[in-house]
Design a protein with these regions (language model features):
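Non-globular targeting/processing and membrane-anchoring segments
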Residues: 22-24, 31-77, 131, 153-156, ...
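Structural microenvironment flanking redox-active thiols in thiol-disulfide oxidoreductases
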Residues: 94-132, 145-148
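Short, internal strand/loop/helix patches
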Residues: 129-166
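Short active-site neighborhood of thiol/selenol oxidoreductases, capturing the structured segment around
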Residues: 72-94
Length: 212
């Protein structure tokens, strides 16, 4: 897939919203105290831990950008699911999503479902989808309570999960990890039985890791 890696545009952050789980916005000292109090009240405090491999993936139903609701349980009936949580202003999300889209174009829809889960409103999410040419389905977490982000214990975005058909999380990836993305692509290849496709082009300089 020969698309150019999109560049982060700091002017495209969109409107300000409550900080969701996984948001690492820089705050003033006063802002940090307010944010931490809010975080404890809404998301269970700083001891939240992202669900790891071997854990059961919480079921969820969320509205999709296309308008129809998405059910994890229903999707798993057809095969494994890749769920990628993101925030539009996160530069690491902006780096990761074009590669996730390559996985989707190579293997998605053939016994593997890939969805993005946005922590932003529909307008800002639509702008992100357009700017970074995201072609897989994108869902909207409730930006007032972030119930699904909370259920998965998000500490950073992007957070990407490979959920096996039995509902068990087999890959739990936080931030950008080349190794994890290659593992997810390998699982998608194995599940679909498709011909192997190039994930990273030889001319691309791919980071091994970037913190979310």
């Amino acid at each position: 897939m020969g698309e150019e890696q999109p560049r982060w545009n700091p002017s495209s952050h969109g409107t300000r919203q409550k900080n969701p789980p996984g948001c690492e916005d820089h705050l003033t000292s006063k802002g940090q105290n307010v944010a931490m109090k809010w975080f404890k009240n809404i998301f269970g405090g700083p001891n939240m831990t992202t669900l790891t491999a071997g854990k059961k993936a919480p079921d969820f139903n969320l509205p999709a950008m296309a308008g129809k609701d998405f059910s994890l349980r229903d999707a798993l009936a057809g095969g494994p699911v890749v769920a990628a949580f993101f925030k539009v202003s996160c530069p690491v999300c902006q780096y990761a999503f074009p590669f996730l889209d390559r996985i989707y174009k190579n293997y998605g829809g053939r016994n593997v479902t890939l969805v993005g889960i946005s922590q932003n409103d529909k307008k800002d999410t639509a702008a992100f989808v357009k700017q970074f040419n995201v072609t897989f389905p994108v869902l909207l977490d409730d930006i007032n309570k972030f119930p699904v982000s909370n259920a998965y214990g998000l500490t950073n975005v992007p957070s990407i999960f490979w959920i096996a058909q039995d509902g068990e999380i087999e890959v739990s990836s936080v931030g950008w990890s080349r190794k994890d993305i290659e593992q997810i692509a390998g699982k998608a290849l194995e599940t679909t039985g498709e011909t192997p496709q190039i994930l990273f082009r030889p001319d691309e300089k791919i980071a091994d890791f970037r913190a979310g």
